[in-house]
Design a protein with these regions (language model features):
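Short acidic (Asp/Glu) and glycine-rich catalytic loops that position anionic groups and cofactors
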Residues: 26-33, 73, 102-106, 135-136, ...
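Non-catalytic, polymerase-adjacent accessory regions of viral genome-replication enzymes
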Residues: 1-45, 49
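Extended C-terminal regions of large enzymes
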Residues: 360-427
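A conserved non-catalytic segment of reverse transcriptases
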Residues: 176, 252-326
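Non-catalytic, peripheral interaction segments enriched in hydrophobic/basic residues
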Residues: 317-363, 367, 371
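Conserved polymerase palm-domain catalytic core
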Residues: 47, 54-69, 73, 108-117, ...
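Electropositive, glycine- and tryptophan-enriched low-complexity nucleic-acid-binding patches
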Residues: 91-92, 96-109
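Conserved phosphate/pyrophosphate-binding and hydrolysis machinery centered on Walker-type P-loop NTPases
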Residues: 9, 30-41, 83, 112, ...
């Protein structure tokens, strides 16, 4: 494919229109200039032609990204770089033209930030490889990958495929556009900030070199962006692969392997893309399930949404719970979790009963509502005057009867187990 005249494809009306729609669809925060995505249409109407001419003449100058720190679950922070909405638009236009070119080069076992690929496919491929006898895992952690990409190495790799100097020029400008941290400018000597529309593609271009090296060595691997695992047949092989691949990453790609987090382990000790793994002795094969840390994160969010002191209606809480449940089940549907779903359904119903009980407030109101729900008068009176031991009351049989699964379902609550059974691909 001729890649010597790509800028005109990037600046074509059809490509720019698609880029605009995608940026607006993605929404996102404003960059250093304060222009919101809702103002992009008006901004392009005034400045669109000028931007195109600047790109053709290599005079377009991207603005610095705005640094945003996102806390990580295990401590520390993840640095995001928020470009201006105009730069997101230009980056998206570039990515749309470059992506089909590089898709032909990318490895089949690379799943992150690629069209029609997802984390679930990566997990299924990993399971298939494990069940072929590759039961030792080399889990390689790249230390601050997006912040440490070597610009010269990346541009050399891009230059092997892209022959349009205008495109090469603008990509490098984005890499060195700088960072604004609390109104102070800082040069971006290395890295491709997470948050830009072009960054995922650039990350895959760099790490495709790792994929090619692993393929050349005949290794079974799965990679999702910078999360990579290699599966081999013995502990000795795994340790050798860890040494050799770590050396390649650091010496050839100029990246840093975090040796404190990288490890050689069996599938049972692995956490990958939120999933854990276990050996099913009945089926005689490895299977995936939500990792304990993913479950803990779900429980924490569920508790936040059913907090009794949260001053919103119970119907709103149910709506937010449904969003959480559907999203979680949709992501983990390839895992085994029937028992977990049953337990979580029971917890959610109990938490909602506590919210409803508190909302009823007075003993007389509680008596009246329990009677309406079919509880006899004496039991309703005894239950209502139990005091403020809400957790104790809401676990009693009378409350399970009065506010049962069917009634909560009629109120709109989605069942985790039912949702999982409908979507599960391994049931």
């Amino acid at each position: 494919m001729d890649t010597s005249s790509l800028m005109e494809q990037i600046l074509s009306s059809d490509n720019l229109n698609r880029a605009y729609l995608q940026v607006v669809r993605n929404k996102g925060a404003e960059g250093v200039d304060g222009v919101k995505y809702t103002e992009l249409k008006e901004h392009l109407a005034k400045n669109g032609e000028n931007i195109k001419e600047q790109l053709r003449a290599r005079k377009y100058k991207p603005q610095p990204v705005r640094r945003v720190e996102i806390p990580k679950p295990d401590g520390g922070v993840r640095n995001l770089g928020v470009p201006t909405v105009t730069d997101r638009f230009v980056q998206q236009a570039i990515a749309q033209v470059l992506t089909p070119i590089y898709e032909e080069q990318f490895h089949d076992h690379s799943y992150g930030f690629r069209p029609n690929r997802c984390a679930q496919q990566a997990i299924l491929t990993a399971l298939e490889t494990m069940n072929d006898g590759n039961e030792w895992i080399v889990d390689i952690d790249l230390e601050k990958f997006f912040d440490t990409v070597n610009h010269d190495k990346l541009m050399t790799i891009i230059g092997r495929t892209i022959k349009d100097g205008d495109v090469i020029s603008i990509v490098r400008k984005y890499l060195v556009s700088g960072i604004m941290i609390d109104d102070e400018y800082e040069d971006s000597i290395v890295g491709t900030p997470q948050g830009g529309n072009l960054s995922p593609l650039l990350a895959n271009i760099m790490l495709n070199e790792l994929d090619k090296e692993m393929e050349k060595r005949g290794l079974n691997f799965v990679r999702y962006a910078d999360d990579c695992i290699i599966m081999v047949g013995s502990e000795m092989s795994a340790n050798r692969v860890m040494r050799n691949i770590s050396r390649f990453i650091e010496e050839k790609l100029g990246l840093k392997v975090n040796m404190t987090k990288s490890k050689v382990d069996r599938p049972q000790g692995l956490k990958y893309l939120g999933f854990g793994f276990y050996f099913d002795t009945r089926a005689h094969q490895y299977k995936a399930k939500p990792h304990a840390k993913s479950v803990a994160k779900f429980k924490k969010r569920m508790k936040e949404l059913t907090c009794r002191s949260w001053g919103v209606s119970n119907s709103y809480k149910v709506m937010k719970l449904n969003q959480l449940i559907r999203g979680w089940i949709n992501y983990f549907k390839i895992g085994s979790m029937k028992t977990l779903c049953k337990e979580m359904d029971a917890r959610i119903r109990c938490r909602l009963r506590m919210c409803i009980w508190k909302q009823w407030k007075t003993p007389q109101n509680r008596i009246n509502n329990l009677i309406k729900l079919g509880v006899d008068k004496d039991t309703a009176r005894i239950t209502a005057y139990t005091g403020n031991r809400i957790a104790y009351v809401c676990q009693r049989r009378v409350m399970n009867f009065a506010i049962n699964k069917e009634r909560l379902t009629r109120c709109g609550l989605v069942s985790m187990l039912d949702s999982y059974t409908e979507r599960c691909v391994t049931c």
